[in-house]
């Protein structure tokens, strides 16, 4: 019985609890390992705070001393009479100098308007000659009477080269002249005949016209055959 009582008295005691709820240790101030590490991290910050304040206090006296030293430096004095002539020379322009400047400014402002009007009139004059040839081109071409008659149909009317019978037949144009193979096309000899208008008229004449019956009468299939 005595042995059992001594064993109970000598039973190991439980470790202390950390405020976070985990088991702590007497070596770590009854804190767990995590809380003890956080506690150690906070201690250097608390130690450095007073040191920084002391360093700032050490710096401020030096700044004040430097300020006092700057104020003690004598500043050179400047005579006000020396500055007055320069200010007067810069800021006091005479009216005689400004007069011609303003006049020239007015002249320069008024002259561009006149030039612009002149340029507009010149541009209209320049454009009008360009419109006249277009009106001539759109109008009718000169008649055959303005051109001289061909003396010999055996020669080209343009280059006066001698033509054979076959060339005379192939080179004859509707304008009434005979040309060689180099000048037989209308674009090459400034033909006065309206080939495009004649072609349109011929195309209209050759068009197939369909006879359409207009009315309401109906005819059955086969009535015409019977």
Curated annotation (Swiss-Prot):
Zn(2+) 3 binds at residues 173, 175, 189, 191. A zinc finger (AN1-type) spans 150-199. The keyword Endoplasmic reticulum does not apply. Zn(2+) 1 binds at residues 18, 20, 32, 35. This is AN1-type zinc finger protein 3 homolog. Residues 49-59, 67-92, 105-114 have a biased composition (Polar residues). GO terms for molecular function: DNA binding; zinc ion binding. The keyword Chaperone does not apply. Zn(2+) 2 binds at residues 156, 159, 180, 183. Coiled coil: none annotated. Pfam families: zf-A20, zf-AN1. Keywords: Metal-binding, Zinc, Zinc-finger. Disulfide bonds: none annotated. The lineage of its organism: Eukaryota, Metazoa, Chordata, Craniata, Vertebrata. Residues 134-146 have a biased composition (Basic and acidic residues). Residues 42-149 are annotated as: Disordered.
């Amino acid at each position: 019985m005595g042995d059992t009582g001594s064993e109970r008295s000598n039973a190991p005691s439980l470790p202390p609890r950390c405020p976070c709820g985990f088991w702590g240790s007497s070596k770590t101030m009854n804190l767990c390992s995590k809380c003890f590490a956080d506690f150690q991290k906070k201690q250097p910050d608390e130690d450095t705070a007073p040191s920084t304040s002391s360093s700032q206090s050490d710096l401020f006296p030096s700044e004040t001393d430097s300020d006092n030293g700057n104020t003690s430096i004598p500043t050179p004095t400047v005579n006000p009479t020396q500055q007055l002539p320069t200010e007067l020379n810069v800021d006091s322009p005479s009216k005689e100098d400004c007069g011609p400047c303003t006049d020239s400014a007015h002249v320069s402002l008024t002259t561009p308007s006149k030039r612009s009007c002149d340029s507009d009139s010149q541009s209209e004059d320049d454009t009008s000659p360009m419109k006249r040839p277009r009106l001539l081109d759109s109008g009718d071409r000169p008649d055959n009477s303005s051109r001289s008659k061909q003396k010999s149909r055996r020669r080209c009317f343009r280059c006066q080269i001698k033509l054979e019978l076959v060339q005379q037949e192939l080179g004859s144009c509707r304008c009434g002249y005979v040309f060689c193979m180099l000048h037989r096309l209308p674009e090459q000899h400034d033909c006065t005949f309206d080939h495009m208008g004649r072609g349109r008229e011929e195309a209209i004449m050759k068009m197939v016209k369909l006879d359409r019956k207009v009315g309401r009468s109906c005819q059955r299939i086969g009535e015409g055959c019977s």
